[in-house]
Amino acid sequence: MSIIDTRTPDSKHFISGVTGDWEVIIGMEVHAQIISNSKLFSGASAKFGAEPNNHVSLIDAAMPGMLPVLNEECVRQAVRTGLGLKARINLKSVFDRKNYFYPDLPQGYQISQFHYPIVGEGKIIISVGPDSNGQFEDIEVGIERLHLEQDAGKSMHDQHPTMSFVDLNRSGVALMEIVSKPDMRSSDEAKAYMTKLRTIVRYLGTCDGNMDEGSMRADVNVSVRRPGEDFGTRCEIKNVNSIRFIGQAIEYEARRQIAILEDGGVIEQETRLFDATKGETRSMRSKEEAHDYRYFPDPDLLPLEFDQAFVDSLAADLPELPDAIKARFVKEMGLTVYDASILVTEKAIADYFEEVAYGRDGKIVANWVINDLLGALNKDNREIEESPVSPNQLGSIIDLIKEGTISGKIAKDLFEIVWNEGGDPRQIVEERSMKQVTDTKAIERAVDEIVANNADKVAQAKQKPALAGWFVGQVMKATGGKANPQTVNELVKMKLGID
């Protein structure tokens, strides 16, 4: 099958070599573990983290005479994912045996889909940026296919000095292999693609996307070429398990290939591993072709067939996906594309934001959620589900500002109190006398005192109006940050005689 080049060479993606510019070409095969109680062809639990070999059925262990029975929930999840990727759903697909020997593959073959996958071509729109002008670039990355397959077990080589052990808990767990087209031209695009794909499957509830647990991992295909020339020979970097490592692996591998070609060498098609400690890729084995696996239809499984009504019923029940939510946030709440993009990265964040924003100014709420809430969560290494500040509490803080009860500065202090101690924000403001001073005469007395004690700066302020900010700061300090900032600003300018 010929590969179509969908992108026009763009100099901002070129990599400078000794002999001229090069372009990196990237495609990805992502293995996403399906959220399901049981495995693809057996009733054994698919739950992560059990003691070795506790979630193994006779089918998973490949005992003689054991026949696979397809898990319908896994089929539903694959179709839902395909719909989320705007892909063609194939009403008929076929399971094949992919034959190879490895200790953690007790059958001697993997049940996969080669010729007739359950999902055909689709697409993902990724946003890369912002650039120096604050603009984002939307890029379409094609999806070639999505197919169902079994995961293998896990070989462990560090448990004994002379023996290796095998854990079959993962053997037979349902995977979706999502294959992109070679449409990415930089490590940033590849990271954005993986981030977006993970976000989509999490919104759909078809994969938890926990890369640290191995439930989502990527095989990254990298090649380089002179801009405008045919695709070069690709190398596959296997099982990269973090978005940061995907970027590092691509950067290293592209430079490695360029160095070889500029020295007059040839790129060998091979499978490589990424060493996260050294930040480099190293050779694993020569890359297999499809014929090496001797694919043929699995005689124990009938072709998988369903009707359009089955697909339509699943489509009708899909949740609102991140692109649609982002567009709604921009259109209905007036958010910037940047802010909306941050808020939809996780469904829980979008849900939190919407709960706080209901009946309030979306821009103000977005500012608090992105800068204060997410900043505090990141500092404490917590997920939003663990936030000590609930949507109701944050909403109350924002309401207190709007009502003029507290200033923005006091609100920051109040947020910190609620974060560390909990409690009702309104009650805290009353009990701790945190209300801002709105009495104009009291504020005016404070302004008069600061002006009277700083005659030299008053004269300077008439020449440099920006010095008014210093006076505002001194008044706020004198009032313990409780004076209404707008009133202070107006009175300072009036007393200094500046516009």
Curated annotation (Swiss-Prot):
Keywords on this record? ATP-binding, Ligase, Nucleotide-binding, Protein biosynthesis
Q: Matching SMART domains, A to Z?
A: GatB_Yqey
Top-level EC class, please? ligase
Q: Which InterPro entries match?
A: Asn/Gln-tRNA_amidoTrfase_suB/E (IPR017959), Asn/Gln-tRNA_Trfase_suB/E_cat (IPR006075), Asn/Gln_amidotransferase (IPR018027), Asn/Gln_tRNA_amidoTrase-B-like (IPR003789), GatB (IPR004413), GatB_C_1 (IPR042114), GatB_Yqey_C_2 (IPR023168), Gln-tRNA_amidoTrfase_suB_CS (IPR017958)
- EC number(s) recorded for this UniProt protein: 6.3.5.-
What biological-process GO terms show up in the record? Answer: glutaminyl-tRNAGln biosynthesis via transamidation; translation
Tell whether Nucleotide-binding is among the UniProt keywords. Answer: yes
Main role?
Allows the formation of correctly charged Asn-tRNA(Asn) or Gln-tRNA(Gln) through the transamidation of misacylated Asp-tRNA(Asn) or Glu-tRNA(Gln) in organisms which lack either or both of asparaginyl-tRNA or glutaminyl-tRNA synthetases. The reaction takes place in the presence of glutamine and ATP through an activated phospho-Asp-tRNA(Asn) or phospho-Glu-tRNA(Gln).
Q: How does it assemble?
A: Heterotrimer of A, B and C subunits.
Q: Under which name does UniProt file this protein?
A: Aspartyl/glutamyl-tRNA(Asn/Gln) amidotransferase subunit B
